[in-house]
Amino acid sequence: MKKFGAVVLALFLVGLMAGSVLAAPQKPAVRNVSQQKNYGLLTPGLFKKVQRMSWDQEVSTIIMFDNQADKEKAVEILDFLGAKIKYNYHIIPALAVKIKVKDLLIIAGLMDTGYFGNAQLSGVQFIQEDYVVKVAVETEGLDESAAQVMATNMWNLGYDGSGITIGIIDTGIDASHPDLQGKVIGWVDFVNGKTTPYDDNGHGTHVASIAAGTGAASNGKYKGMAPGAKLVGIKVLNGQGSGSISDIINGVDWAVQNKDKYGIKVINLSLGSSQSSDGTDSLSQAVNNAWDAGLVVVVAAGNSGPNKYTVGSPAAASKVITVGAVDKYDVITDFSSRGPTADNRLKPEVVAPGNWIIAARASGTSMGQPINDYYTAAPGTSMATPHVAGIAALLLQAHPSWTPDKVKTALIETADIVKPDEIADIAYGAGRVNAYKAAYYDNYAKLTFTGYVSNKGSQSHQFTISGAGFVTATLYWDNSGSDLDLYLYDPNGNQVDYSYTAYYGFEKVGYYNPTAGTWTIKVVSYSGSANYQVDVVSDGSLGQPSGGGSEPSPSPSPEPTVDEKTFTGTVHDYYDKSDTFTMTVNSGATKITGDLYFDTSYHDLDLYLYDPNQNLVDRSESSNSYEHVEYNNPAPGTWYFLVYAYDTYGYADYQLDAKVYYG
């Protein structure tokens, strides 16, 4: 309902501001086309179908009439014939009818019984089959997604996850599936207490095969990321795909207690709540503790996108690797949950393929869109997450001494840049994972800069680079109450990338095929002070200039300036539903933001941002947290913020902080 309401709001706002609403183009009148006489009133598809049926068989149809009056007259005749009327529609003059073939032929004018003669129901336009509609999707096989994340390159180097066990905390695993036979070496069922592996939903089997399936049922085509890894099934979700937090925590606890017994190094949780979390709940603490116990914990970001603040538990846990979903073209999916967390930390860390992934289908289940008896396609961050879990197994095989923190750092700092502007992002995180580059993390050239930046201050660092295909710089800092930004300048002093997410966690900039010379990174405090560290990584040669060097020195842009305004007001979900405020944007602006504060325990307010042409460019419709909107490189002109009362307990007071950034 909230999304529909937002659309209505957008149209209403344009009408108020522009003074008029354009009328929709007139649609051409529908012409009543006569059926070919050999089909009668049946569509060709229905005519063909009934030719293969006996007269006493029933067929499901949609009967379309010229008007509602003709439709209502037909009901009595259809009842007399014994036809079953499933739906009597109001939106169109039509009936959904299940009817015997012989009676269908009579009303279609294809059969003269002598009782009805050759008379037809009056006003019938046509009769069509009530056919089954399937979701039109573009699937991605594991052969495609493995290449997308460069797992295939790891296989070519001889790494397949052998010696590593992945715990799948989910609906179970169908261990009899050809792709998973001989792989499930441990099992526990906290739902039904069964001692033999099974999956009565299909979700867990699909996830398990993405992480470590052999692809045996497809001659290796749909092979998982770490086909040599072993699996442990930890069933905490029932046949409907749901489960209690207590069971999930117990599953995490069991994985930690049995990690040495089964060699568990990675656990995958393609599950979670849809409500925004600050990462302090019991399940988030449990997965953080599993991380501290030495397990790489990989968690699905959730499927509550595209709104901000939709990362729930346990995805909001601070230590785990939270994964969003992109399609085969590295475009973020609409459903992938967006950060930040409820306490304004950056999530997810990375993204991976998760849009209609073809993987193993558990026996007797129909989850997703079945491809055949052995495979089904399904979308979700649930599918993206085991890609990363499998990659983690590859990394740990290649680097047995790596800690969970090292795995996470390597994945973040080598993730491919797939978003055209800032990399560190509440949708994409650090980018799409690259297994091959992460595995070579220790072999790449690296520089680390550390320092301290005061409130509103900045620090710059220079490095030389040559022979590189890429360079990235990732900024970390120690004060969660501060907001640091990161800028990258080429040897000519041109700003080539920037990252200012406004959230605590990390900022990342990067550039492909960098020109040889002296480059500059600049750490800027938008607010607060902090100790920081910047990791520079490249496949070329890195160094630090001595005495300034002979390369031209970059001339970083001046400190960003901010035009700030604070608006206050009161709204009510019945009497005064919305307020509109304007903000002037001048040339050279780099970002416009709005933060809406109110008492979230009693009220649910939403925030919308419109450009000078009154196009909706960002929205924030969280149900249990403050609202934030932003837009990069805004055009000059008057911008509009709309505060909307979705649900209030009486009148709701609010404060809106609007900011325009320059420089």
Swiss-Prot record:
Residue ranges, annotated region (Disordered): 537-565
Effect of residue 382 to A: Loss of activity. Greatly destabilized
Keyword annotations: Calcium, Hydrolase, Metal-binding, Protease, Serine protease, Signal
Protein's organism: Thermococcus kodakarensis (strain ATCC BAA-918 / JCM 12380 / KOD1)
Range of residues in the leader sequence: 1-23
PROSITE patterns xref list: SUBTILASE, SUBTILASE_ASP, SUBTILASE_HIS, SUBTILASE_SER
Subunit structure: Monomer.
Thermal behaviour (record text): Optimum temperature is about 100 degrees Celsius. Highly thermostable. Stable at 80 degrees Celsius for at least 3 hours. Half-life at 100 degrees Celsius is 100 minutes and at 90 degrees Celsius more than 3 hours.
Active-site residues (renumbered): 170, 203, 382
Short name of one Pfam family: PPC
Domain notes: The C-terminal calcium-binding beta-jelly roll domain (445-562) of the mature domain is not required for folding or activity, but it is required for the hyperstabilization of the protein and possibly for its adaptation to high-temperature environment.
EC number: 3.4.21.62
Protein name: Subtilisin-like serine protease
Activity regulation information from UniProt: Resistant to treatment with 5% SDS, 8 M urea, 10% Triton X-100 or 10% Tween-20. Fully active although less stable in the presence of 10 mM EDTA. Activity not affected by the absence or presence of 10 mM CaCl(2). Unstable in the presence of 2 M or over GdnHCl and loses 35% and 99% of its activity upon incubation with 2 and 4 M GdnHCl, respectively, for 1 hour at 55 degrees Celsius. Nearly fully loses activity upon incubation at pH 2.0.
Propiece residues: 24-136, 563-663
Top-rank taxon: Archaea
Residues the UniProt record annotates as site (Important for catalytic activity): 303
Protein family membership: Belongs to the peptidase S8 family.
